[in-house]
Every structure is written in structure tokens, then in C-alpha cells.
């Protein structure tokens, strides 16, 4: 029997096994597993970096919130020498004055030079407040700023018909009346006219009254002085303090 097979008892038979149908599936599964593992290894550093970034951002936000809380807490218990923001200045604290008329002493009138009026600064409706002072016909400005300046002067006379005045030879009776608010500055040699008002009295009959009101805003400097000049001091109506007055206040 052994001889028919051509094999000796000392030899080992070798049999080649052919692969069966469908035996390539294990290889395909192994390739998919390797691809999935590769993707995981590639994505793992990205996921780790993203996690680290989110963690650091959260810690940073918590740190900033802690710093803000400490700053607010420090301000709450800050010492009194630190800067404190003062409230807006109230109008009642600003310099202001209102002067009323007093009886005037006639003075000699020079050409192109109008006499200045005297004022009451304490009695009746008159006052000076918050470092605004009155002295020797002048209002003294205590601090620089924008001021509203005003004055009303009421004139009165007995007759002002220009033709009759000229025919009678009475040159002391005016054809017009003038009021000027003047500023005097130590650094400037000449007075500055801030406001001027003029009215004709030729068309007015006997026993006439003429008020002239002036008012406007001006930028003034500390130390400036204000006064009111008139063309004829003898015609100023001083009978009532609400007819002739002068004032200024810081805006």
C-alpha cells in the first residue's frame, strides 16, 4: 500500500490547502481597525488641546472676576485721601450781585467821558454774594468765567423839545440819553465798552420818562471791574430801586 502511494514511512506528506471562498474578510476588518486607530491617534492631540484651552479660559475668567471683586472691595474701604469726585456746582454757590440806585451827586461832565453811577449794595433788594464785591462804583469779578451782565437806567426830565432847547440856548439839556456798561482791566490801559444804549428824547414832551435796558453774556477774568456810565447823571431816576439797577452773575 505504501509503495503504491510512492511514499515511504519516513517522509511527511505535504498537502496544500486552497483558501475557501470569503477568507479575505479578516484582512478587511483588520485594515478598518487600523484606520480607526490612526484617526483616534490623530484627533487625540486636537481634543486634548481644545480641552486645555477651554480649561485655561475658564480659569482666566474666574481670575479676572476675582480681581474685579478685589478692586471693588478695595474702593469700598479706600482711605479718605484718595480722589473724590465733587458734585456739580450749585447755582447758589456762584458769584452774583444786584445793585440798586442811590441819589447821585452831580459831577462835571467832560467831552466823550460819561460819569459813573454810585450804587447801593446792601439794603433793600441789593446784595453781593459768594465773593462778588462792590467798591467805589465798581463790581469786582472774583473768578474767571462767563457772566451775564445787565443794567437798567431810567431817565426823567421836564422838557426835551429840541427846537425849544436850541432856541432857548440851553445846551445842557440833551438831545439824547446814553447808558454804557464798561469793563476796566488792570492789564489794559483803556476801559472797554461792553454794552451801549442810546435813545432820542427830542420827540418826547414834558415830564418824560425813558428807561434803557442792557444785558448780555461776556467772558470775564478774575480781577476785572465793571461800572455803568451815563450821559447825564442829573437825569437819572433814583426814586425807586426797581427803576434803575445793575448786576452780574456767573453762568
Swiss-Prot record:
Tissue: Specifically expressed in endothelial cells. Detected in monocytes, placenta, lung, liver, kidney, skeletal muscle, pancreas, spleen, prostate, small intestine and colon.
UniProt keyword list: Cytokine, Disulfide bond, Glycoprotein, Membrane, Secreted, Signal-anchor, Transmembrane, Transmembrane helix
Residue numbers on the Extracellular membrane side: 57-251
Principal location: membrane
Site (Important for binding TNFRSF6B): 187, 190
Induction (free text): Up-regulated by IL1A/interleukin-1 alpha and TNF.
Site (Cleavage): residue numbering on this chain: 71-72
TM regions (residue ranges): 36-56
Gene3D superfamilies: 2.60.120.40
InterPro entries reported for this sequence: TNF (IPR006053), TNF_dom (IPR006052), Tumour_necrosis_fac-like_dom (IPR008983)
Membrane topology: Single-pass type II membrane protein
Single Gene Ontology BP annotation: cell surface receptor signaling pathway
A GO-annotated cellular component: membrane
Topology feature Cytoplasmic, residues: 1-35
Subcellular localization(s) per the UniProt record: Membrane
GO terms, molecular function: cytokine activity; signaling receptor binding; tumor necrosis factor receptor binding
Pfam families: TNF
PANTHER family in UniProt: TUMOR NECROSIS FACTOR FAMILY MEMBER, TUMOR NECROSIS FACTOR LIGAND SUPERFAMILY MEMBER 15
Family recorded in the similarity comment: Belongs to the tumor necrosis factor family.
Protein name: Tumor necrosis factor ligand superfamily member 15
Protein's organism: Homo sapiens (Human)
Gene: TNFSF15
Amino acid at each position: 500500500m505504501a509503495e503504491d502511494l510512492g511514499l515511504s514511512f519516513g517522509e511527511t506528506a505535504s498537502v496544500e490547502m486552497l483558501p475557501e471562498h470569503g477568507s479575505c474578510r479578516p484582512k478587511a476588518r483588520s485594515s478598518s481597525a487600523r484606520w480607526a486607530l490612526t484617526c483616534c491617534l490623530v484627533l487625540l492631540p486636537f481634543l486634548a488641546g481644545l480641552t486645555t484651552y477651554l480649561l485655561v479660559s475658564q480659569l482666566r475668567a474666574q481670575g479676572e472676576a476675582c480681581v474685579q471683586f478685589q478692586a471693588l472691595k478695595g474702593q469700598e474701604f479706600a482711605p479718605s485721601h484718595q480722589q473724590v469726585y465733587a458734585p456739580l456746582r450749585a447755582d447758589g454757590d456762584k458769584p452774583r450781585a444786584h445793585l440798586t440806585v442811590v441819589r447821585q451827586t452831580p459831577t462835571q461832565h467832560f467831552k466823550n467821558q460819561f460819569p459813573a453811577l454810585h450804587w447801593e449794595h446792601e439794603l433793600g433788594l441789593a446784595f453781593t454774594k459768594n465773593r462778588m464785591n462792590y467798591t467805589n462804583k465798581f463790581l469786582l469779578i472774583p473768578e474767571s468765567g462767563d457772566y451775564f451782565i445787565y443794567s437798567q437806567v431810567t431817565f426823567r426830565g421836564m422838557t426835551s423839545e429840541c427846537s425849544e432847547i436850541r432856541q432857548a440856548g440851553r445846551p445842557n439839556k440833551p438831545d439824547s440819553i446814553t447808558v454804557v456798561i464798561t469793563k476796566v482791566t488792570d492789564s489794559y490801559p483803556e476801559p472797554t465798552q461792553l454794552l451801549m444804549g442810546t435813545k432820542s428824547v427830542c420827540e418826547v414832551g414834558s415830564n418824560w420818562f425813558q428807561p434803557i435796558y442792557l444785558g448780555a453774556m461776556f467772558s470775564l477774568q478774575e480781577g476785572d471791574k465793571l461800572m455803568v456810565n451815563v450821559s447825564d447823571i442829573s437825569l437819572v431816576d433814583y426814586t425807586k430801586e426797581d427803576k434803575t439797577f445793575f448786576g452780574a452773575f456767573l453762568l
